[in-house]
Amino acid sequence: MNEFELYLDRNGFGNMKGAAAAKALPGTTVLYGAEMDFPTAPCIRKALADFAMKGMYGYTLADDDYRQSVCGWMKMARNFEIQPMDIVTTLGTLFGLNTALRAFTKEGEGVIVQHPSYFNFDKAIANNGRKVVANSMKEENGVYSLDWEDLEAKMSDPNNTFMVLCNPHNPTAKVFHPDELKRIAALAEQYGIIVFCDEIFAETAVKGHEVRPYIEFGPKHGITATSLGKAFSFTGVNHANLLIVDEDLKKRYLAQRKKDHFGSMDPFFYTALRAGYTEEGWNWVQAMNQHTQEIYEMMAKAFAERMPLLSLSPLEGSYVCWLDLRKLNLSCEERQSFLSEEVKLLANQGEDFGPDGEGFMRLNLTATKAVIENFLNNLEAAYKKRGY
């Protein structure tokens, strides 16, 4: 059986995606969030089941076996060698970002982030009393690029001391390629900016695209965040690994992590990582990537042939895609009503990602083909009923 066509029942488990679906109209298609509809890799499920039966769930450390698993994965899946002691564990990417903001910035200082932006980045910045400094990307026919002049102007402002980069970019699915990363790193080095790069979607880059670790280009000022979360749909077990090469940067980060009371990692995460960061796990991720690429192509073909006023940004990395609905000429409220009541779709509105997301919608590609076909048929019927 193709497990990528198996739809998981989320009822009764407190699942966030399931809870959102429960509030929607009956028959609603849920392409909300960035969590897979199908089960995670068999190697992880088996390892967790075996571990659960041991009944041993105590404090857990990042020992040598754990670190070697991360090093092996970075070499196999990312073609990048890291040193075991450059791995810093934390309780999640956003937890790690919050710690970094407190370690390296002061209240009132500016933090640069590319917009449209994953909303929790902006929340983390604001919640720590720092200022969100938007570096709005340029968009042309759904293709996004950095506004380099604006980025340098903001990096050169002494009030701005930190940048959050997301690669692959969420929500646009853009991959920042090596020439772009080199240029970002050169500017950050010139102006003394610390860069926190969220790379938790890195392993989902599609063919022809590669996510190089930011620390390859900015080892003195860069922090790379990695995780099982997206590649294996493991976001509910809080965890992340930060890769920090510079010793002073690492020392300062660890001091703040201690203040934030890190404690120990979740033993289930330890077990899942060692099982997933293997050749079997990597083969599963590559098969999952092929499935999401087919879903994307299925959507793109339907829009081009059946609903030409709608279009998708290119999918370079991640399993979310960015749908452009601007040609429908609907206000935010009208668009929400059209999608939720007429199309019966639950997904992330573009406005969730800031003003630069207006007129767009983020869709999750890690669904079954049957679910996507149902969504496309419902969308086409509502689209044509409106006379588009």
Give the ranges of each region predicted by the language model:
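N-terminal small-domain helix-loop-helix segment of the aminotransferase-like
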Residues: 2-92, 99, 279, 386-388
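PLP-dependent aminotransferase-like
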Residues: 102-165
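PLP-dependent enzyme catalytic core of the Aspartate aminotransferase-like
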Residues: 331, 338-347, 353-388
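Conserved glycine-rich beta-strand-loop-beta hairpin in the small C-terminal domain of fold type I
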Residues: 274, 290-300, 312-325, 357
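Helix C-cap/helix->beta junction micro-motif
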Residues: 128, 190-191, 343, 386
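Active-site phosphate-binding strand-loop segment of PLP-dependent enzymes
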Residues: 138-209
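Conserved core segment of the aminotransferase class I/II
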Residues: 46-47, 221-293, 301, 383
